[in-house]
């Protein structure tokens, strides 16, 4: 069953594209019409393609792998952070650091530095250094947390990316493509859909449109993870029953 309804998408403004003069011709198959100089997205196609994307996201999440949520534009950053944290997924909602994927080992060093400063605050180290040194370390930590806090617990490359605004996040898109990491994205009428593996034709500027899509992604991940945990618990119980039965037969 679909997580979306056409009326719900209309209320969220998912159908509003960009000015027709700013369009990408490759988005023509997903455009319903032009109205007052603005392209209107075909929501029937959005509905189908969003459902296909969510099924693929569910398949990834059900294996325990991570999906990184990316959206650094003003309208998206709070939504990305809230929904990613709710789903327990890594995210980037501030600046995308070049090499965040392609040079992940170096990024991990910065994360370790961030965690080291965090430990200094609690293990007594701060009591043994000057006020100026403490201030410098706290400023360094704040900067690292702002940029890397969303991936602090990410120990390996994500299995996929979900992106809001592929034009703005072009560096993230380029890095993911170079590594063969699947890309799910909201793709507006001014974007190149060829850069994305799972296209969701949608308004990537309106807050309600972004929230609708990102929340659906988070809900899908949470449901898939919950089902995975249930299946693992059942498997453990079955294994324990078999072990108990084997012990009983040997007595």
From Swiss-Prot:
GO terms for cellular component: cytosolic small ribosomal subunit. It holds the Pfam family Ribosomal_S2. Residues 232-251 are annotated as: Disordered. Signal peptide: none annotated. GO terms for molecular function: structural constituent of ribosome. NCBIfam families: rpsB_bact. PROSITE patterns: RIBOSOMAL_S2_1, RIBOSOMAL_S2_2. HAMAP family: Ribosomal_uS2_B. Belongs to the universal ribosomal protein uS2 family. InterPro entries: Ribosomal_uS2, Ribosomal_uS2_bac/mit/plastid, Ribosomal_uS2_CS, Ribosomal_uS2_flav_dom_sf. The keyword Ribosomal protein applies. This is Small ribosomal subunit protein uS2. Keywords: Ribonucleoprotein, Ribosomal protein. One of its GO terms (biological process) is translation. CDD domains: RPS2.
